Amino acid sequence: MHEMSITQNVVEICEKSAEGRRILAVVLEIGELSGVVPEAVEFCFEACTAGTLAEGARLAIDRVPGRGECGNCATVFPVRTYFDPCPACGAYGVRVVAGEELRVKELEVE
């Protein structure tokens, strides 16, 4: 489960940003195409925050839907996988424009 190490890294990033202040809430953005399972991050969060400035912090996850842009006709459309064809022209040269995110969006500290 790589979500454990990802969650540990998120906590480290939050602690550095908090500059010694207690962390009350963390909001993450996780894209549907990121390969990260939000439920697994939620499961790991409590264990990863134990004994840190983020212990007891609330975690919210904003899920970012996948979107792609067709390289052939420039149509922007929802994608669920990297292999979705363009619904307008059927081409497979799709550039992902959203859904790969994995970032700390907000941090609430004391």
From Swiss-Prot:
<feature type="binding site">
    <location>
        <position position="89"/>
    </location>
    <ligand>
        <name>Zn(2+)</name>
    </ligand>
</feature>
<feature type="binding site">
    <location>
        <position position="2"/>
    </location>
    <ligand>
        <name>Ni(2+)</name>
    </ligand>
</feature>
<dbReference type="GO" id="GO:0036211">
    <property type="term" value="P:protein modification process"/>
</dbReference>
<keyword id="KW-0862">Zinc</keyword>
<feature type="binding site">
    <location>
        <position position="86"/>
    </location>
    <ligand>
        <name>Zn(2+)</name>
    </ligand>
</feature>
<feature type="binding site">
    <location>
        <position position="73"/>
    </location>
    <ligand>
        <name>Zn(2+)</name>
    </ligand>
</feature>
<comment type="function">
    <text>Involved in the maturation of [NiFe] hydrogenases. Required for nickel insertion into the metal center of the hydrogenase.</text>
</comment>
<dbReference type="Pfam" id="PF01155">
    <property type="entry name" value="HypA"/>
</dbReference>
<dbReference type="GO" id="GO:0016151">
    <property type="term" value="F:nickel cation binding"/>
</dbReference>
<dbReference type="GO" id="GO:0008270">
    <property type="term" value="F:zinc ion binding"/>
</dbReference>
<dbReference type="InterPro" id="IPR000688">
    <property type="entry name" value="HypA/HybF"/>
</dbReference>
<dbReference type="InterPro" id="IPR020538">
    <property type="entry name" value="Hydgase_Ni_incorp_HypA/HybF_CS"/>
</dbReference>
<dbReference type="GO" id="GO:0051604">
    <property type="term" value="P:protein maturation"/>
</dbReference>
<protein>
    <recommendedName>
        <fullName>Hydrogenase maturation factor HypA</fullName>
    </recommendedName>
</protein>
<feature type="binding site">
    <location>
        <position position="70"/>
    </location>
    <ligand>
        <name>Zn(2+)</name>
    </ligand>
</feature>
<keyword id="KW-0533">Nickel</keyword>
<comment type="similarity">
    <text>Belongs to the HypA/HybF family.</text>
</comment>
<keyword id="KW-0479">Metal-binding</keyword>
